[in-house]
Structure formats: C-alpha cells, structure tokens
Amino acid sequence: VTHCSNIVGTVNNLKKISELAHEKNAIVIGDGVSFAPHGFPDVKELGVDFYTFSLYKTYGPHLGLLYGKKEILDKLPNQNHEFLEGDVPYTLNPGGPNHEELSCLVGVYEYFMNLFEHHYPGENPSIREKIHKVNELIAEHEKEIANPLLDYLTN
C-alpha cells in the first residue's frame, strides 16, 4: 500500500488501511518511498506488517530498507546459506550486507543530528523527537520553495 502519492503528495491513512486489512487477515506492506523523505514513519503506530523504502530518498546511499514484524519474518523461507537458517535478518540477505553502503548511514544520522543542534542548541529530546523536529524544518523549507510555483500554477 502506497503511504504517500509521489504525484500529488496525498498521504494515505495507512493505520486505518492496516486495521481494515487485518480484519480480513491480510498482511500489509507499506511502501514508504514517497513518504519517508518528508516524514519519519512510526511503523508500529501504522500497524503495518512490513514497511519499505529506498534510503537514497532520505539522503542516504542507494540501499533498500525493510521493516518486518519478527513473527512474520521468522516464518519466511531462508534465502541465504543453510547455516543461517532461522537467523533473521540474515536469512533474507543472500550474499550478506553491503558494508560500504551501510557505513554511509552514519552520515545520514550525523546530518540530522547536526541540523537539530544548529536549530535547537542545548535541547536533548529522544532521537525520534530530534528527527521529527528536523523533518518539520525540512517540510517548512520545502513549502517556502514550492509555494511560488504552486501559486503560479493555480492562478
């Protein structure tokens, strides 16, 4: 299920969709590729079984990210070497992780933390709250640069 339209920006109510789907015993996979650059998805709050997006959409390397509920991941067949059977998440990562790209994730974290420190010196909330506040700053900046175009197109 698409979390957010990449054309018009409509954010779908993934929590409600998950609730309705789970009533019918369906598994919900959230596609966050268009949402993640503009928000910080709380996958547990959304109630999805899986959530995925590309990290290059959020200032990172060209690497896919997959969240999955452990009780479902444990039931999936092994895609890796036989000696890794039952060792989630390695069972889903044939060939192993790309260490070079994974190391780039430190830069994404540092970028967000530096933005937070610059705009909120001395504050020390949770990492989730820091990222949320930085995303709000980015969203405000996006509005500032997009509004002239939107005004032009609608007038």
Predicted ranges, named:
Residues 1-155:
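Pyridoxal 5′-phosphate
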